[in-house]
Amino acid sequence: MKVSKYVAIFFFVFIQLISVGKVFANADEWMTTFRENIAQTWQQPEHYDLYIPAITWHARFAYDKEKTDRYNERPWGGGFGQSRWDEKGNWHGLYAMAFKDSWNKWEPIAGYGWESTWRPLADENFHLGLGFTAGVTARDNWNYIPLPVLLPLASVGYGPATFQMTYIPGTYNNGNVYFAWMRFQF
């Protein structure tokens, strides 16, 4: 009984190590694709984009009412970017935006976004997207130290107008913010 228990543990650990090796082998390939997509979006943009922040919403279940009553949820600001659609119909974008944060202080953000895009209707202009953004932001309450961000993206669009959004996870009274903006392609 003891021997079979140790054999089972050995095989479990061995399989995990093989899996980790495959993940790291694929990580190089993934990082190469990531860099190539950023470079192609920078060097060969199809569109230039105007970003207009629309709403921030602090999840009420994750905040004291006194805090949410004081927070800014109208993120005035704007941004500019460039983007392209790849051969699979997925969206790639490089952007820079500045907006008023929860404390009504300016917050810049710049980065790369990618969304897998679906066109579920007969009208090809309507599109839905799910993906991520990776970039850098800086906040007043962190003395504008550059902070890396990796966040989910989702969107609903028609033609050149897209309502794009993310969710910033967090803890109680911190993070847990829905942030959305309009993106217009030219």
Curated annotation (Swiss-Prot):
Subcellular compartments: Cell outer membrane
The protein's Enzyme Commission number: 2.3.1.251
SUPFAM superfamilies registered for this protein in UniProt: OMPA-like
Active site feature: 58, 101, 102
Catalytic activity: lipid A (E. coli) + a 1-hexadecanoyl-2-acyl-sn-glycero-3-phosphocholine = hepta-acyl lipid A (E. coli) + a 2-acyl-sn-glycero-3-phosphocholine; lipid IIA + a 1-hexadecanoyl-2-acyl-sn-glycero-3-phosphocholine = lipid IIB + a 2-acyl-sn-glycero-3-phosphocholine; lipid IVA (E. coli) + a 1-hexadecanoyl-2-acyl-sn-glycero-3-phosphocholine = lipid IVB (E. coli) + a 2-acyl-sn-glycero-3-phosphocholine
Site feature: Role in lipopolysaccharide recognition: 67
Site (Role in the phospholipid gating): 172
Similarity remark: Belongs to the lipid A palmitoyltransferase family.
Protein name: Lipid A palmitoyltransferase PagP
Species in which this protein is naturally found: Escherichia coli O6:K15:H31 (strain 536 / UPEC)
Taxonomic lineage of the native organism: Bacteria, Pseudomonadati, Pseudomonadota, Gammaproteobacteria, Enterobacterales
Gene assigned in the entry: pagP
